[in-house]
Amino acid sequence: MEGGAYGAGKAGGAFDPYTLVRQPHTILRVVSWLFSIVVFGSIVNEGYLNSASEGEEFCIYNRNPNACSYGVAVGVLAFLTCLLYLALDVYFPQISSVKDRKKAVLSDIGVSAFWAFLWFVGFCYLANQWQVSKPKDNPLNEGTDAARAAIAFSFFSIFTWAGQAVLAFQRYQIGADSALFSQDYMDPSQDSSMPYAPYVEPTGPDPAGMGGTYQQPANTFDTEPQGYQSQGY
């Protein structure tokens, strides 16, 4: 297959980790992976407080367990998704089929855009619940830094995932253009629909000394009728 299809070279080449880590979409995946760890790690470790009066834990975001559950779920799933697509980035240059590369890039566009939307919803949801939280529920301000960190990195994750979607779309455009060129281009020498070129008699010196004319071999059988020849006895 042609080199450069959908942002990668020819299949079967040696794995180059240096080239991999320099790719913008790979860098954004690693950053998104780290952001997801911060979000779900902050909520799991310090997002639940102990109630002295009730004797049970409650979510730091306005005592709304759905807010904490959403943040943890999105963070964990985004963490796994980043690992999946990082593995795809490693394997992508080995994909020899242009159609398979196209499917991988299209899935990258859809998944990245979907996660950007989920992080936007998560940011708005956590920020709203944090804003309406009652100070009396947490008089000692326990876990407030972790709660703010989860909100902040949810906001940052919107742009890292949106950036991945944009980069994947650019790779799709490059791949679509190269695939269109490879399908439309045809070597004229391989085109069977073109008429044969007329024969042109060479005008240069004749290396065989034939004088540029066709000569019948001496031993060729003569098919023309011959007259009767008398034979002497």
Curated annotation (Swiss-Prot):
Lumenal side: 45-71, 125-148
Cellular component, GO, one term: Schaffer collateral - CA1 synapse
Highest taxon, organism lineage: Eukaryota
Composition skew (Polar residues), residue ranges: 213-233
Matches recorded under InterPro entries: Marvel, Synaptogyrin
Protein keywords: Acetylation, Cytoplasmic vesicle, Membrane, Synapse, Transmembrane, Transmembrane helix
Gene Ontology biological-process entries: cellular response to leukemia inhibitory factor; protein targeting; regulated exocytosis; regulation of long-term neuronal synaptic plasticity; regulation of short-term neuronal synaptic plasticity; synaptic vesicle membrane organization
Cytoplasmic side: 1-23, 93-103, 170-233
Residue span, MARVEL domain: 20-173
Localization per record: Cytoplasmic vesicle, Secretory vesicle, Synaptic vesicle membrane; Melanosome
Residues modified to N-acetylmethionine: M1
Membrane topology reported for the UniProt record: Multi-pass membrane protein
Record-annotated membrane-spanning stretches: 24-44, 72-92, 104-124, 149-169
Region (Disordered), start-end ranges: 194-233
PANTHER family: SYNAPTOGYRIN, SYNAPTOGYRIN-1
Role description: May play a role in regulated exocytosis. Modulates the localization of synaptophysin/SYP into synaptic-like microvesicles and may therefore play a role in synaptic-like microvesicle formation and/or maturation. Involved in the regulation of short-term and long-term synaptic plasticity.
Record-stated family: Belongs to the synaptogyrin family.
Name of the protein in question: Synaptogyrin-1
